[in-house]
C-alpha cells in the first residue's frame, strides 16, 4: 500500500530535516526521503553552529538530526527520488524502492560544488568550499583561491581580512573577470599565478602543504578555496514547473513557498548564504509555512458556512498516529505518558 503524508521532504540536510522536525511537531504526518551524501555530510568538523562542538563531524550531526525527527513520528527513507507527479489531491513521489503520496512537497535538494577541471588530487584537508565556514582556519597562513571569474577574484580580496599571504590561481586559463575587477586586484596585495598545477604535497596528517606548478616552482599553502560555481539540483523542481532565479536557485517566499501550489523549497537550492545555521532557520520557517497552509483550525467563516461549526468530534486536529507519539515522547508536559490510550486505540 502506498503511504500517504501531509508533508514529504526530499533531501536530508540541515534545512530539510529542520523543516521535517517542525512539520512533525506541529502535527502533520511527515516523511523524509534522502539519497544520502550532500555538502553537510562531507564536513570533517562542524563550525559556526551554536551548541555543537567543532569535533562533531557532518555525518554525526546529521545522524543526530535524523534520530530527533524520527523520535517525533516522522518516517525516514534512505532513497533517491527520481520522479514527482501531480495528482488530483497532491503529489506522487517515486524513488528506487519507495512510492508515497503527499499533500505538500518540500524540495531540499541542495547543490553540488563545481570541481576544478582537470581535477586536483583529493586531500580531504586543504581544499575547502565554504569561505564563511573555513576562512577562520587560515588566519595568518598562506592561502590560495582558485578560479578565473569575478567571484574568485573577490574571494581572494576577501581573504586579505584573514591573512596577508593570498595567491589567486588561474591554472593556465585566461582570466574572465571584468576590467573593474582587474583594477581592484591591482590595488590589493594579491599575486595572480597563471601556471597550471601538476602536483601536490601533503604532511603526515594529509593536510595540503604545497602545490607544484608546471614551471617547476613550489608554493607553500595551508589551504584554499576552489571557486568554480555551483550546480543546483533542480531537476525535480523543473519537472513540476517551479520558477527559478537567474542564478539557478529556486524562487521562494519567506516561508519557502514556490509558484506551484503545495511545493516548497528550502536550503542551499534557494537564494541566500550556504550555512548550516541559516539553512536551519529557513527550514524552521518552511515548516511553519506548511503548518499555516495545512492546519485544520481555526476554520474560516467560509469553511464554517460550508462545513458547519467545529465540534468536539472534530478535534484535536493532530493525527492519531502523531498523537500517540506526542503523549509518549519524553518531551511531553509532565513526562511521557506511556500508559495513556490514544484516541482510536482499543
Model-assigned labels for residue ranges:
Residues 3-60, 147, 153-175:
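Beta1-alpha1 glycine-rich phosphate/pyrophosphate-binding loop at the start
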Residues 29-31, 35-37, 44-71, 130, ...:
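N-terminal glycine-rich dinucleotide-binding loop that anchors FAD/FMN and/or NAD(P) in oxidoreductases
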Residues 121-137, 228-277, 288, 292:
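FAD-site-proximal beta/loop scaffold in flavoenzymes
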Residues 2-5, 76-141, 223, 250-254:
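FAD-binding core/adjacent interface of flavoenzyme oxidoreductases
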Residues 10, 107-108, 145, 213, ...:
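Redox-cofactor binding/interface segments in oxidoreductases and associated redox assembly factors
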Residues 69-87, 93-94, 100-102, 163-250, ...:
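A Rossmann-like FAD-binding core segment of flavoenzymes
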Residues 20, 155, 266-320:
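A conserved FAD-binding loop/helix module that cradles the flavin
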Residues 82-87, 294-346:
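A short, charged, Gly/Pro-tolerant segment at domain boundaries
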Amino acid at each position: 500500500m502506498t503511504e500517504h503524508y501531509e508533508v514529504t521532504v526530499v533531501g536530508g540536510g540541515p534545512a530539510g530535516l529542520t523543516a521535517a522536525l517542525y512539520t512533525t511537531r506541529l502535527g502533520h504526518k511527515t516523511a523524509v526521503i534522502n539519497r544520502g551524501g550532500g555538502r553537510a555530510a562531507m564536513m570533517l568538523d562542524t563550525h559556526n553552529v551554536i551548541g555543537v562542538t567543532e569535533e562533531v563531524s557532518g555525518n554525526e550531526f546529521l545522524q543526530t538530526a535524523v534520530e530527533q525527527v524520527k523520535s517525533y513520528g516522522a518516517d525516514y527513507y534512505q532513497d533517491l527520488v527520481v520522479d514527482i507527479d501531480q495528482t488530483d489531491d497532491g503529489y506522487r513521489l517515486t524513488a528506487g524502492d519507495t512510492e508515497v503520496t503527499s499533500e505538500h512537497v518540500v524540495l531540499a535538494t541542495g547543490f553540488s560544488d563545481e570541481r576544478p577541471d582537470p581535477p586536483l588530487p583529493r586531500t580531504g584537508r586543504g581544499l575547502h568550499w565554504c569561505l564563511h565556514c573555513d576562512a577562520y582556519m587560515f588566519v595568518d597562513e598562506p592561502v590560495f583561491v582558485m578560479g578565473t571569474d569575478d567571484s574568485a577574484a573577490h574571494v581572494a580580496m576577501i581573504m586579505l581580512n584573514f591573512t596577508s599571504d593570498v595567491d589567486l590561481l588561474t591554472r593556465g586559463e585566461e582570466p574572465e573577470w571584468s576590467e573593474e575587477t582587474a583594477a581592484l586586484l591591482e590595488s590589493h596585495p594579491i599575486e595572480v599565478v597563471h601556471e597550471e598545477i601538476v602536483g601536490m604535497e601533503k604532511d603526515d596528517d594529509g593536510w595540503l602543504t604545497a602545490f607544484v606548478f608546471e614551471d617547476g616552482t613550489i608554493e607553500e599553502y595551508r589551504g584554499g578555496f576552489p571557486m568554480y560555481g555551483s550546480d543546483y539540483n533542480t531537476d525535480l523542481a523543473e519537472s513540476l514547473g517551479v520558477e527559478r532565479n537567474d542564478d539557478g536557485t529556486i524562487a521562494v517566499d519567506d516561508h519557502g513557498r514556490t509558484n506551484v501550489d503545495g511545493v516548497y523549497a528550502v536550503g542551499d537550492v534557494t537564494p541566500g548564504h550556504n550555512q548550516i545555521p541559516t539553512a536551519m532557520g529557513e527550514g524552521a520557517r518552511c515548516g511553519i509555512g506548511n503548518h499555516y497552509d495545512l492546519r485544520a483550525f481555526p476554520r474560516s467563516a467560509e469553511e464554517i458556512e460550508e462545513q458547519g461549526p467545529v465540534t468536539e468530534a472534530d478535534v484535536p486536529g493532530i493525527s492519531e498516529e502523531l498523537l500517540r507519539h506526542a503523549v509518549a515522547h519524553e518531551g511531553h508536559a509532565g513526562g511521557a505518558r506511556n500508559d495513556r490510550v490514544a484516541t482510536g486505540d482499543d
